[in-house]
């Protein structure tokens, strides 16, 4: 995988980036031509942000080692909205940082 400014890493990878827990896969949001299994399908229901906001507004992403990641706040809000049992655990992990 090479850095691409039109792709944003999301999901549990962000928790791994902060040392909160390991991730098992890499979820992506694509600015152009997203595959059907991308996280673009969850933008309206779980993220409540526009694609343009996530990809282009620095308030909602950060760079690490050349790769673009959604911020921890974006993941926290997404997990609160989705509210699965694993998400509630992850929200507690995120809140333990503050």
Task: Tell where the protein language model's regions lie, with residue ranges.
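Residue-level detector of alpha-helical segments with a strong bias toward transmembrane helices
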Residues: 21-22, 29, 76, 81, ...
């Amino acid at each position: 995988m090479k850095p691409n400014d039109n792709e944003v890493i999301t999901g549990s990878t962000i928790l791994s980036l902060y040392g909160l827990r390991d991730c098992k896969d890499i979820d992506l949001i694509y600015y152009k031509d997203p595959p059907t299994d991308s996280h673009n399908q969850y933008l309206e229901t779980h993220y409540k942000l526009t694609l343009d906001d996530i990809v282009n507004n620095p308030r909602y992403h950060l760079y690490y080692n050349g790769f673009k990641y959604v911020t921890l706040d974006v993941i926290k809000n997404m997990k609160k909205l989705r509210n699965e049992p694993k998400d509630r655990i992850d929200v507690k992990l995120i809140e333990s940082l503050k």
